[in-house]
Amino acid sequence: MKFLFDLFPIILFFVAYKVWGIFTATAVAIGATLVQIAWVAFRHRKVDPMLWVSLGVVTVFGGATLVLHNDTFIKWKPTVLYWAFSVVLVVSALGFNKNLIEAMMGKQIQLPHRIWGQLNYVWAVFFVLLGILNLFVAYNFSTDAWVNFKLFGATGCLVVFIVGQSLWLSKYMKEE
């Protein structure tokens, strides 16, 4: 359910793009992210810092898209967000000795410390590569193809990555 909730702004962006075009879709994405944060704040009182980062990035890049009437900025938004996630994972591990992947998933699965460290860096590399792939699609294909990639391609990459990660991790998981 949380996965669908996280996709809420992307799905609305996709639908708005198909009906009204990139500029309306961009405004819808900004509004949907604001609604998403308001809902989380109302329901849980605490908003995840990455959701605030997402709002900042969509507002800055979406705002630039709307003000300058240039869709290049909104196309950069996913890459900036993916690369921000990557930087946060690496800096938290190297600078603060905190493994954020372990902090998020450590209660669900038990893994050796070394594997948590590897997993943290694997996610960081995945986000860098996904950002590069987003730019490749944005600059080499039509806006229509990029919008489809944003919803289906990036989500598909994430699902394939998680399945592959699960297969890799299964040999390290401790029996309960």
Swiss-Prot record:
Pfam families: IspA. InterPro entries: YciB (IPR006008). It is a multi-pass membrane protein. The chain crosses the membrane at residues 24-44, 49-69, 76-96, 121-141, 149-169. It comes from the Bacteria. Disulfide bonds: none annotated. Plays a role in cell envelope biogenesis, maintenance of cell envelope integrity and membrane homeostasis. This is Inner membrane-spanning protein YciB. It comes from Paraburkholderia phymatum (strain DSM 17167 / CIP 108236 / LMG 21445 / STM815).
